[in-house]
Swiss-Prot record:
The lineage of its organism: Viruses, Varidnaviria, Bamfordvirae, Nucleocytoviricota, Pokkesviricetes. InterPro entries: Poxvirus_mRNA-cap_ssu (IPR005009), Poxvirus_mRNA-cap_ssu_sf (IPR043096). Gene3D superfamilies: Poxvirus mRNA capping enzyme, small subunit. It holds the Pfam family Pox_mRNA-cap. This is mRNA-capping enzyme small subunit. GO terms for molecular function: mRNA 5'-cap (guanine-N7-)-methyltransferase activity. It comes from Swinepox virus (strain Kasza). Its EC number is 2.1.1.56. Keywords: Methyltransferase, mRNA capping, mRNA processing, S-adenosyl-L-methionine, Transferase, Virion. It catalyses: a 5'-end (5'-triphosphoguanosine)-ribonucleoside in mRNA + S-adenosyl-L-methionine = a 5'-end (N(7)-methyl 5'-triphosphoguanosine)-ribonucleoside in mRNA + S-adenosyl-L-homocysteine.
Length: 287
């Protein structure tokens, strides 16, 4: 419990290793690889609680999260930490300290309004912006199309789970000599989003990677039609890297599981009111 409180109050970060050898790139657009136990069990352990929340009516979810859904200011926090004064995104041809892509559903928890679903057996889709590996699209590599003299490449990841997110980060670890992941205290601790900060470009591998990507896309420039699910590697990345990534993501998911458990217990509490012991614990933890 002390560890979870510390994670939420102080945030979590990790520096990932640099790999001089670029993995074998095999880009395919249109479909994400399915989740695999090889890439960590934390998602599967957490999914049952996410599904419990997913089937509850969204008006009720809004009520019980209204006071604990603080504005997500983690990107601004990272800018402050790194002394970034200017950023560019979406192809803007300006000089900046960083090129940025935000793939997260900022300040949003669910995708559409819906009523109660009576049991998890009737769930057909994930209506929450939580633990949804399909949210990661090829836009995660868009900053590379816009990169020129910027010191940093920053991506807000919508999720930390799935083969594709680990494969993507592994590729970035060969394109830049420094890759860090942050789950800031000022991010939402209801969602499994995080920030990747890459710096110190390794030009040799960037050139090889972008040549392959542009060949597959049949274009030198970014197109919005590229913003779809994708697969970037055929083979699994090495176990050493998976374990290093899981050091970070497991700490995030352990904290989220506790938060989600408190929220779910509050929403189904006997007194049918937002004034209950679970909500008080949740409020104390997140505010």
């Amino acid at each position: 419990m002390d560890k979870i409180t510390r994670n939420i109050r102080e945030g979590i970060h990790i520096l990932l290793p640099f790999y001089e050898n670029l993995p074998d790139i095999s880009l395919s657009l249109g479909k994400s690889p399915l989740p695999s136990l090889e890439y960590g069990t934390n998602y599967f352990l957490q999914l049952s609680r996410v599904n419990d929340l997913n089937r509850l009516p969204t008006d009720m979810l809004s009520l019980f999260t209204h006071d604990i859904m603080l504005p997500e200011t983690d990107m601004e926090k990272v800018y402050d930490i790194l002394n970034i004064k200017s950023v560019k995104s979406y192809g803007k041809s300006i000089k900046a300290d960083a090129v940025v892509a935000d793939l997260s559903a900022r300040n949003r928890l669910f995708k559409k309004d819906r009523e109660l679903i009576k049991s998890n057996n009737y769930l057909t889709d994930n209506n929450l912006y939580i633990s949804d590996y399909k949210m990661l699209t090829f836009e995660v590599f868009r900053p590379l199309f816009d990169l020129s003299s910027e010191k940093y490449c920053i991506v807000k990841l919508p999720t930390l789970f799935g083969k594709c997110v680990i494969d993507t980060i592994r590729v970035y670890c060969s394109l830049f000599k420094s890759v860090r992941l942050f789950k800031c205290a000022s991010d939402s601790w209801l969602k499994d989003s995080a920030i990747m900060v890459a710096s110190d470009i390794y030009k040799k591998n960037i050139d090889i990677f972008m040549s392959h990507i542009r060949s597959v896309l049949k274009s030198q420039y970014w197109k919005d039609s590229n913003n779809v699910q994708f697969s970037i590697l055929k083979e699994s990345v090495d176990k050493e890297f998976i374990n290093k990534f899981l050091e970070f993501s497991t700490s995030v998911y352990e904290s989220l599981y506790y938060v989600h458990s408190l929220l779910y217990s509050s929403m189904i509490s006997d007194n049918k009111s937002i004034e209950n012991e679970y909500q008080k614990k949740l409020t104390k933890l997140l505010l």
